[in-house]
Design a protein with these regions (language model features):
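Secretory targeting and sorting signals
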Residues: 1-30
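Secretory/extracellular carbohydrate-interaction modules
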Residues: 31-117, 130
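Activation corresponds to long, low-complexity, non-globular regions
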Residues: 32-53, 57-67, 186-256
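Residues within well-ordered beta-strands of beta-sheet-rich folds
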Residues: 53-59, 140-146, 154-156, 310, ...
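Short, aromatic/His-centered strand-loop micro-motif at the edge of beta-sheets
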Residues: 118-142
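Carbohydrate-binding surfaces in secreted/extracellular proteins
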Residues: 135-167
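Flexible glycan-contacting loops in extracellular carbohydrate-active proteins
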Residues: 170-196
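Lectin-like carbohydrate-binding module/patch detector with strong preference for beta-trefoil
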Residues: 253-391
Length: 391
């Protein structure tokens, strides 16, 4: 089976990540593709059993943030026909999704209320059955695919913490069983389709993938290998292997993606939207992309698409803006001290590395749109901030 990969957008595929799914090293990413981390766990079953059902599990241990674009997936094949996968996504501020997709098929039936099935195109064609679910970090979700006769395979997802169960749908294939070979669990950061994306824009995530079991739990796979996407983000990934699971850690050293909140509970904001030169201001929290920050391992504070919080000078009253990160280090790391900030967990201040001065709400004015500045650190409420968590 040729490994193919359907991403969150039904009509979009990328060969670079697809080659990694069955253990083949991906090529260097093209310049027009963003640089994001990816990790893979490959499995094998002893004795090549005929599998009429397989159950996987995913526990997202720390939520990377509602504005994160991350896909946790279980890929597999059939004894006839092409491949499939199912998993869960965080969709960049849109509704979160469970999905089950099969290549080169044309018939599908929806499952539980709220699910739907649709065709997709791109690198081949197929069917995808989906359901929106605001899944919960820390809960273990099982994903079961089972033969239902006459080539139909159904996918069911269960939240083991609550007992809730959801059938995503049933898809007709030419197969009679699930292949015991070629199973891969992977984590994809699909901001790769943003040409500006870098390793340091991406939020930290860690997910526990339980080893697959088949035929009602009577056979269990083992981990045969692990790998990463092999790009500049590789050093920021880690896969921890145990007897019954792997934990895939990505964007290690970065925080999750979320709000930076300050005086009056208002948010650090890129005024009017994300772009180079935009004023950094205080504004009511909206959950928008212009308030979705990552505290990066290089000391920068970043919005999506490689934009950084930056000081325009070093003196008291110097303007603070959102600037192109323009990182020249590996993976887009920033070395410009004007774009680097130190967070004090005791004083709750954000201190600019170039000046040693604090991010400040001038005069304590909490009116929406108040432009932020640098000022000598004084410990006042107008210099205190809460930031996205690191783990």
């Amino acid at each position: 089976m040729r490994s193919r990969h359907l991403f969150s957008t039904l009509t979009t595929t990328v060969a670079a990540a697809a080659l990694a799914l069955l253990g083949t090293a991906p090529p260097t990413q093209a310049a027009e593709i963003g640089t994001t981390p990816g990790t893979y766990t490959n499995y094998s079953f002893s004795g090549a059993p005929v599998l009429t059902d397989v159950t996987w599990s995913t526990t997202v241990q720390h939520d990377p943030g509602y504005r994160a674009n991350v896909f946790w997936s279980h890929q597999f094949g059939f004894n006839q026909g092409n491949g499939a996968y199912l998993g869960m996504q965080s969709n960049g501020g849109s509704k979160r999704t469970l999905l089950f997709s099969v290549w080169d098929v044309s018939e599908a039936k929806a499952g539980s209320t709220g699910s739907w099935c649709q065709s997709f195109g791109g690198e081949g064609e197929g069917m995808s059955c989906r359901m929106n679910l605001d899944w919960t970090a820390g809960h273990r979700y099982t994903f079961k695919v089972a033969a239902e006769g006459d080539g139909w395979f159904g996918a069911t997802v269960a939240d083991t913490a609550t007992g809730a169960s959801y059938k995503l749908g049933t898809i007709k294939t030419p197969a009679t069983a699930i292949s015991p070979s070629g199973m891969v669990d992977w984590t994809e950061y699909f901001e790769w389709n943003d040409s500006r994306a870098t390793c340091y824009d991406q939020p930290f995530s860690d997910a526990r993938f339980g080893v697959p079991t088949g035929n009602g739990g009577t056979v269990t796979a083992s981990v045969s290998s692990t790998s990463n996407s092999g790009n500049a983000c590789a050093s920021m990934t880690r896969t921890d292997v145990s007897a019954d699971a792997t934990v895939q850690n990505l964007a290690v050293g970065n925080s999750v993606r979320g709000a930076v909140t300050g005086q009056a509970g208002k948010c650090l904001d890129a005024f009017g939207g994300v772009g180079d030169g935009v004023v950094a201001d205080l504004y009511a929290c909206s959950g928008g992309a212009n308030q979705a920050w990552v505290r990066a391992a290089d000391g920068s504070l970043r919005l999506p698409s490689d934009y950084c919080l930056a000081a325009d000078g070093t003196g008291n009253g110097a303007a603070v803006r959102v600037r192109d990160c323009a990182g020249t280090g590996t993976g887009g790391a920033v070395t410009d001290a004007a774009r680097q900030w130190t967070y004090s967990t005791s004083a709750h201040t954000l201190v600019n590395k170039a000046s040693g001065r604090c991010l400040d709400v001038p005069g304590g004015d909490t009116t929406n749109g108040t432009a932020l500045v640098l000022w000598d650190c004084a410990g006042g409420a107008n210099q205190q901030w809460s930031v996205p968590a690191t783990f």
